[in-house]
Amino acid sequence: MKKELEAKYSYEIVEENRYEWWIQNEYFKANPDSKKPKFSIVLPPPNVTGKLHIGHAWDGSLQDAIIRFKKLNGFDVLYLPGMDHAGISTQVKVEAKLREQGISRFELGREKFLEQAWKWKHEYAAIIRQQWSKLGLAFDYSMEKFTLDDDINKIVTEIFVDFYNKGLIYKGKRIVNWDPMQKTAISNVEVIYKEVEGFMYHFKYMIQGTNEFLNVATTRPETMFADQCLVVNPKDERYTSFIGKKAINPVNNQAIPIIADDYVELDFGTGVMKCTPAHDLNDFEIAVRHNLEKPICMNEDGTINEMGGEEYQGLDRFEARNKIIENLTKEKTFIKAEPMIHQVGFSERSNAIVEPYLSDQWFVKMDSFADMILKLQESNDKIKFFPERFDQVLKKWMENIHDWTISRQLWWGHRIPAWYNKEDKTKIYVGMEAPKDAENWIQDEDVLDTWFSSGLWPFATLMRGEGFESKYFKEYLPNGVLVTGHDIIFSWVSRMIFQTIEYTGQIPFKDVLIHGLVRDEHGAKMSKSLGNGIDPMDVIVNNGSDSLRFSLLTNSTPGQDIRYSDSKVKAAWNFINKLWNASRYVLMNLEEDFKPWEEQAILNSNSLNETDKWVLTEFSKVSKQVNYLIDKYEFAIAGKMLYDFVWNTYCSWYIEFAKVNLNNPKTKEATQQTIVYLLKNILIMLHPYLPFVTEHIYKTLDMKNSILEESWFDKEFVFETDYINVVIELINSIREFRATNNIKNNVLLNWNATNGNLEIITKYNLEINNFLNEFVNANLSINESLVSETTSLSVLDFFIEIPNDDFIDKEKMLEELATKKKELENEISRSERMLSNENFISKAAPSKIEEEKEKYELYKQQLELIQDKLNKM
C-alpha cells in the first residue's frame, strides 16, 4: 500500500484536474433506473448577466455539500445545473454594450438584437461553467438547462395556454410599476425603496365660481394633468359643503368634481387628495368605485404627452415638475413646498425612479393560488422551511396577495403566445402556435416575466422533451431541497410551489433551506459602490477552493447572514494543513505490505488497546451528532464538531497516544488499523466540506477508486473509556502546571486526588497512572493525608493537589484560583441566560441543549470546589 503525500500541502496540486476526473468518470451522473433512494437538487439558475459572486459560491457550496452527503449515504443523486436568461437584467447589459458602439436595439431590430443577446449568453455561460468547476460542484452536466431552451419554451407556452384557458391568466388595464428608462413593467420585488429627500407641494384648487380654494398636496405635480377629481372623507365636516361642487385644476384650468370616499384619512395632510387614476394604485381603485375616466399624461419614456399641452408636452417628468412650480408660482396658485423624507421606488435594474402607470398587461389571477399555498402549509404534506419561521413569511405574502403582472415590454425572453386580429384588435387568440390564417394576426410583442419560466424550474428541467413520461421527472420530483435566499421567497419560491402543483399535481421540493446575505467582516452588505465585494475566483486562486468552501460552510447557519473575512479562509487553510500533516504521519507509519482490515474485523477485534477503543467511541458520538445536524442543514455546528474532533481528539491526542503504541509490538497492528480506519472515515465525513483534499488523501490509502464510492460512517462503538477523557484533562493540567512553575520534565511529580467526584479516578487508578507516567512523569494517589501546605488544581469535577516545595508561589496560586473563580461565575451566568432563553430552547438541537445543561452542572461543581479551596486557604 505504501504511498506518501507531498511534504507540503499545495492546493494547486491537489485541486488541479480533479474536477475533470470526477466528470470523466461520471461520479455525478444520475441514474433513474437505479434501485437506490433518490435525492435531487435543481440549482437555482444564476443569471447570465455576468460572473458568479461570493453569494453564488456560498449557495453552491451548501447544495454541493448536501448532494455529496446524500451520495455517501447511499442515495442516487441528481444535482442539475442551469442558467437563467434574466430578461430585463441581460437586456440592460446587452443594450449598454451596444450603446458603447453607438447602436440602439431599435436600429438593430428584434432578430438582430436577439442574436447579440445569445452571443452574450454563450460568452457568460462558458465563464460560469468554468467557475462551477473551480468550486467543485457535483453537477450532472448531461442534464444542464437554460430557461430559453426549446423544450423549456414549449412547457412555458403550454402552461400559459393552460392557465389562460382556465381563466387564470387575463389581459387588462392595471396600475403597474413602470421603468421609464427600460420602457417596461417590472414586478414589486424588482422595486427598491430608498429614503429620499423631497417635497410635499401644496396647490390651490379654486372652487368653481367662487374665491374659495382647497389646499391640495402632492409629491408628484407632474401627474396633475391627469387629475380626474378631488376626494374628501364623507365624515370630514371641514369639507362636506364642497362635495358635489367642482374645483379648477390649476395646471390646465379644467373643472373636476369633488367627491367623497372613505379611503381619505381625516388626519392625513390637508384631508383633501387629488385623484389621478392612471398614475396611482389607490387612485385607480377609487376611480373604479366611482366610474371615473383614467387618462394617462405620460409617455412610456416618462415624458409628458399631449395632455400637457404645448408648454409641457415632450418635457421629462421632472423638468415638467419644475416648470409647473415656476408657472403656478407666478399665477399665485402654488402655496408652498414642504421638505420631507419619503420612500421612493427605484428600478433594481436601471436605477430609474419607478412610475406607477396604467398599462395594458397580462396578469395571473393569484387568489386561488394563494389559497392553495396556505392550505398546503397547514397540512401534513407541507413543505418544510429551515428555519421554520420563514414558513410564516411565505404565508404573510399569500395573505396579502395581488394579481401578478407577467408581461414585460422586452425582446429577450419567452414571447407571449397571444395573437391579435389585424382587423379587430379586441379579438385575441392564445395557443401553442399561430392561428392557421397567420397572415391575419399579429403576435404580442411582449415577453413573459423571467419569474414565470423560473417558476417551472423544479419540473420543467426534468421533462427532457418527454413531458410526464420522462424517467427523470418520475424519479426526481419532488426535489429533495431548495437552497435559496430569503429575499426571493415571494418572487420565486411561492411561484414554483403553485405553478408546479397546478401543472403536475406534486409539490416542487420537500424542504426549503433559507440563507441570508454574504456581508463583509464588519457586517456591511457587499456592493460595488463600497468596494467591499469579493470575487470567489480570486479567493480560490490565493487559497484554494476547499479553504473557501470550508470557511463558508462552517459559518453557515440556516436563515442567517454570513460574514466573509480573509482570516476565516486562512483558518480553513490551517485546518486543511493540519489534516494533511496528520495524514502524512499516518502514511509514514505503514509498511509497504500494509492491508487494512475489513470493517467487521475492527468491530470484533479483541486486540484494540484502550486509546483505540476510546477514539472509536468518541468518533461514534461525533458522527451521530454530525448526521443529525447535517440532516437539519446545520453545517456550522456540524463543521465545528468535525473540526474539534480532527484537530483535538485525533491529531492532538490520539496521534500522540499512537506514537507510543506504534513502537510497541503488542499494540502496533491494532493501532495502525485504527488510525487508518479513522482517517478514512474522517475523510468521508469531511468530504462534503472539503471535496478536493479529501479525495486526494483518500487515494493515497489505496482503497476504492474514489472516495465517492465509499459509504458514510454509521457504526457505533461503545467502549468504557471515559476515563481517558479524565487522563487528557490531567495531562493538560499537569503540563500547564510545569510550564507555569518552570519545572523540568525529568522532575517526578506526585499528586493526590481529593475533594470531588473520584469515582473514575478510583476505578481506573492503575490505567490513569500508566498514562501519567508515560506522558507527564507524574503519579496520582487518592485521598492521601498531606501534612505540608499544598497547591491545588481544578480538574473537571475534582481537585488534585501537590505538597508545596520551593517551586510553589502561594500568592500566584491564590491569584490563579480567583481568576478561575471569576471565569466560572461568568460561564454560569452565560449558561443560565441561554437555558432561560425561549428561542434557544425551542430552536436548538436537543443534543445542544443537553450539552449546555451538562456544562452548567459542571461549572457549578467546579466553582464549589474552588470556593472550598479558597476558604481553606
Swiss-Prot record:
MF annotations from Gene Ontology: aminoacyl-tRNA deacylase activity; ATP binding; valine-tRNA ligase activity
Keyword vocabulary terms for this entry: Aminoacyl-tRNA synthetase, ATP-binding, Coiled coil, Cytoplasm, Ligase, Nucleotide-binding, Protein biosynthesis
Reaction catalysed by this enzyme: tRNA(Val) + L-valine + ATP = L-valyl-tRNA(Val) + AMP + diphosphate
GO cellular component: cytosol
Full protein name: Valine--tRNA ligase
Pfam families attached to this UniProt entry: Anticodon_1, tRNA-synt_1, Val_tRNA-synt_C
Family (UniProt): Belongs to the class-I aminoacyl-tRNA synthetase family. ValS type 1 subfamily.
Role of this protein: Catalyzes the attachment of valine to tRNA(Val). As ValRS can inadvertently accommodate and process structurally similar amino acids such as threonine, to avoid such errors, it has a 'posttransfer' editing activity that hydrolyzes mischarged Thr-tRNA(Val) in a tRNA-dependent manner.
GO BP annotations listed: valyl-tRNA aminoacylation
Oligomer status and interactors: Monomer.
Keyword Transcription regulation: no
Compartmental location: Cytoplasm
Residue stretches in coiled coil: 804-873
Entry keyword annotation includes Coiled coil: yes
Domain notes: ValRS has two distinct active sites: one for aminoacylation and one for editing. The misactivated threonine is translocated from the active site to the editing site. The C-terminal coiled-coil domain is crucial for aminoacylation activity.
Protein origin, superkingdom: Bacteria
Motif ('HIGH' region): 46-56
Enzyme Commission number(s) from the entry: 6.1.1.9
Gene (name only): valS
SUPFAM superfamilies for this protein: Anticodon-binding domain of a subclass of class I aminoacyl-tRNA synthetases, Nucleotidylyl transferase, tRNA-binding arm, ValRS/IleRS/LeuRS editing domain
Enzyme category, top tier: ligase
Motif 'KMSKS' region, residue numbers: 525-529
NCBIfam families the record matches: PRK05729.1, valS
